[in-house]
Amino acid sequence: MPEAEILFSETSHYLKAEDVTQLKNAYLFGQGAHSGQFRKSGEPYISHPLAVAGILSKLHLDVPTLTAALLHDVVEDTDISKAEISERFGESVAELVDGVSKLTKIE
């Protein structure tokens, strides 16, 4: 079973169906935003945000946190803006994504 399907299956045990749908939408959005980007290992870039979301799902974290995990590099590494994340997934998700992006700039 592909990693994304595992995430959706695992989260369906503790999230509502509409929340799992949001995760699927975030995954597809992130996959599209990172299209053509690859990790140093050669894997598609989306594999990293998906792995982060998978780890957080084992802690049974909420849907905004998991959504932000799937999107955490989108603003930093693509042309997608925080405003677009907010429009599509809500202000709380956009703030989480923005906060993670700012962590990389702390010295």
State each model region's role:
Residues 1-107:
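Active-site helical microenvironments for divalent-metal-assisted chemistry
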